[in-house]
């Protein structure tokens, strides 16, 4: 999968201000029947997104017309908690979200986001509420800011994850940067 670099990103936001959204709520286990990264978007938030008859739930924010085509999810605390299934990150990415802004994340879910070309940002509740009302926001990853037309918020990110996302690199790309050193090490080994 080619990873598109994230430097400056402008997108529409959708709020989903629940705390403790776990991976089973993101992608119910009944839908974990494949190992490819695509095809999970229709099942993301399945139990909230659809009514019992299979139609869209009009009360689920991402289904509302004003949030159509939103690519930035703003949510609560402890997002992605629960089991460590990478399918949860795949489902959110396949749903159409490139950026998630939460109060906190499960460590494993956070890492799974970065491995799947999504930027997980941590901001406090006041900032998230402000951004949720903005409609459209801009993320500047190199400068680590999230902005509206009239206000800006700083965020922190580990330099390793930042480098990968800014440069569109995955774990294999990072490993290949050390290919010569790996070959030299292997050549020097006496078995």
UniProtKB/Swiss-Prot annotation:
InterPro entries: 3-IsopropMal_deHydase_ssu, Aconitase/3IPM_dehydase_swvl, AconitaseA/IPMdHydase_ssu_swvl, IPMI_Swivel, LeuD
The entry's keywords: Amino-acid biosynthesis, Branched-chain amino acid biosynthesis, Leucine biosynthesis, Lyase
E.C. designation(s): 4.2.1.33
Gene3D superfamilies in the cross-refs: Aconitase, domain 4
GO cellular component, one term: 3-isopropylmalate dehydratase complex
Biological pathway: Amino-acid biosynthesis; L-leucine biosynthesis; L-leucine from 3-methyl-2-oxobutanoate: step 2/4
SUPFAM superfamilies referenced in this protein's UniProt entry, alphabetically: LeuD/IlvD-like (SSF52016)
Classification via CDD domains: IPMI_Swivel (cd01577)
Cited Pfam families: Aconitase_C
Substrates-to-products reaction catalysed: (2R,3S)-3-isopropylmalate = (2S)-2-isopropylmalate
Keyword field contains Transport: no
Keyword Kinase among record annotations: no
An example Gene Ontology molecular-function term: 3-isopropylmalate dehydratase activity
UniProt GO BP: L-leucine biosynthetic process
PANTHER family: 3-ISOPROPYLMALATE DEHYDRATASE SMALL SUBUNIT, 3-ISOPROPYLMALATE DEHYDRATASE SMALL SUBUNIT 2-RELATED-RELATED
NCBIfam families: leuD, PRK01641.1
Stated family: Belongs to the LeuD family. LeuD type 1 subfamily.
Function: Catalyzes the isomerization between 2-isopropylmalate and 3-isopropylmalate, via the formation of 2-isopropylmaleate.
Quaternary structure annotation from Swiss-Prot or TrEMBL: Heterodimer of LeuC and LeuD.
Name listed for the protein in its UniProt record: 3-isopropylmalate dehydratase small subunit
Protein encoded by which gene: leuD
């Amino acid at each position: 999968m080619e990873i598109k670099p994230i430097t400056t990103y402008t997108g529409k936001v959708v709020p989903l201000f629940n705390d403790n959204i776990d991976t089973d709520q993101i992608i119910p286990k009944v839908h974990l029947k494949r190992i490819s990264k695509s095809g999970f978007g229709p099942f993301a938030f399945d139990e909230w997104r659809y009514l019992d008859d299979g139609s869209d739930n009009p009360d689920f924010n991402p289904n509302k017309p004003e949030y159509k085509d939103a690519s930035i999810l703003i949510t609560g605390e402890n997002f992605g908690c629960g089991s460590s299934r990478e399918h949860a990150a795949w489902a959110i990415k396949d749903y159409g979200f490139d950026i998630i802004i939460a109060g906190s994340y499960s460590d494993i879910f956070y890492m799974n986001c970065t491995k799947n070309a999504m930027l997980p940002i941590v901001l406090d509740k006041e900032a998230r509420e402000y951004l949720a009302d903005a409609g459209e926001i801009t993320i500047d990853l190199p400068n680590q800011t999230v902005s509206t037309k009239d206000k800006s918020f700083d965020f922190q990110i580990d330099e390793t994850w930042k480098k990968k996302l800014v440069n569109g690199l995955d774990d294999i790309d990072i490993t290949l940067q050390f290919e010569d050193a790996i070959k030299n090490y292997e050549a020097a080994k006496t078995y």
